[in-house]
Amino acid sequence: THAKPEDYPDIFPNKKNQFDFGGKDLDLLNQSLLEYSNSTNIPIIKEPFRDSAAKGYYMPSTHSITLNTKNTETENVHTLIHELAHAEMHNNNKLKDKELSMNVPPVMEYQAEMTAYVVGNYYGLDTEKHSLRYISNWTNNLEKVEDKISSLSEVKKASEKLSLSMVDEILNM
């Protein structure tokens, strides 16, 4: 094959991504996310995922996030934003009040990834190709998202809350 390493994620979806970062300080961005999770009582657990290509997951029953220690630095930041979005929009308290059409995996993954894209992009993390592919796969090109307006309204609120909280965390460091 004549494929270059940067093409691997397109060819092999489970290969590691090294997203472009045009911001000033990826460590500071990561630290602001960790501070946000701490201030909102969302424990972050880091462990190697031996039999899974997953980058991380949010567990509503424990209101915690687990990240794969095999992630690249930029994957870790992106995944943490994605999982924090789940924690914000899909925790047990919020899920019980949602319409059934909003409480299904395709919608929840769409919302979390859209939030991760919006927040990451705001801070200079370019996940566009990955995010489009991820959303397309989960939603069958949005066919599985019935209420697009309500879904995006929640994404907007979660993106604003997370972005503004991160700014506050950065300013307080």
Q: What are the functions of these language-model segments?
A:
Residues 93-101:
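Substrate-binding clefts and substrate-entry loops adjacent to catalytic sites
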Residues 103-104, 117-173:
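Long, well-structured alpha-helical subdomains associated
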Residues 63-79, 102-107:
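Short pre-active-site segment immediately N-terminal to the catalytic Zn-binding motif
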Residues 108-111, 115:
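C-terminal catalytic core of tyrosine-transesterase DNA break-rejoin enzymes
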